[in-house]
Curated annotation (Swiss-Prot):
Source species of the chain: Chassalia chartacea (Chassalia curviflora)
Per UniProt, location of the Cyclopeptide (Gly-Asn) cross-link in this chain: G45-N75
Name this protein carries in UniProt: Chassatide C2
Cystine pairings recorded for this chain: C48-C65, C52-C67, C57-C72
Modified residues (Methionine sulfoxide): M63
An individual GO BP term: killing of cells of another organism
Amino acid sequence: MAKFANYLMLFLLVASLVMLEAQSSDTIKVPDLGKRLLMNRDPNGIPCAESCVWIPCTITALMGCSCKNNVCYNNEL
């Protein structure tokens, strides 16, 4: 029960900070952390969580991933 209360308080704190930020500006802006998470800094594409060192992309190939530099990447954004 204590963990739930801690998570609930953390959620309420974050929600209130987001609400204050949204009300303080006329337009809703994406925070810097959100911009960093949305930006793709890898020139190969988005990693598909599969390597292709010994065998080609098998499971993630169904999602459009291909092998580049021994890692499966998805280039469709």
